[in-house]
From Swiss-Prot:
A Pfam family assignment: V-set
Gene name per UniProt: MPZL2
SMART domains: IG, IGv
Protein's UniProt name: Myelin protein zero-like protein 2
Its membrane topology: Single-pass type I membrane protein
Subcellular location: Membrane
Alphabetical list of PANTHER family matching this protein: MYELIN P0 RELATED (PTHR13869), MYELIN PROTEIN ZERO-LIKE PROTEIN 2 (PTHR13869:SF21)
Domain Ig-like V-type: 26-140
Disulphide bond pairs: C46-C122
Amino acid sequence: MYGKSSTRAVLLLGIQLTAIWPIAAVEIYTSRVLEAVNGTDARLKCTFSSFAPVGDALTVTWNFRPLDGGPEQFVFYYHIDPFQPMSGRFKDRVSWDGNPERYDASIFLWKLQFDDNGTYTCQVKNPPDVDGVIGEIRLSVVHTVRFSEIHFLALAIGSACALMIIIVIVVVLFQHYRKKRWAERAHKVVEIKSKEEERLNQEKKVSVYLEDTD
């Protein structure tokens, strides 16, 4: 009887640990795809979430897989302090731009070259959270950045706003011009009436004078 109870307790504990363990995995978030111009700098953004509080045990590892194949290359390592590569293509070309307290493990890559094309991996371990999917960013170094759908949308919105502003300005100017024309016409009408009244008065005076002389 005691043996069966112990077995059930162990099984129950195993089920509970299995249910808890996936929650404890570190989750990585990246832009997945990044396009940058040759010779410029790029921020490789990598953020994460962890079940455990961030502490001094946290480590961040960045590696690189070339587009044309070949062995994986070391890019950057962080553990309390940043550690830059002492040799290789990324020497003096990479810097830490993250903040573990804000769950940010990003880096900056300087002076991009065409042979930097490839996949950059971001791995974060925050014991006891050491499992999880490694984040990836596929970097494409190009001569010029192509317009994306967001750029076209921003351009369309900007053009529409500019058109609306122009229409409003035209309407305001037209209304102002129209009021000015009406004011000028009203002034001319008043002036004509005034002259006509003055002429009639003069004629009346002449008529009265002639009658008196007769």
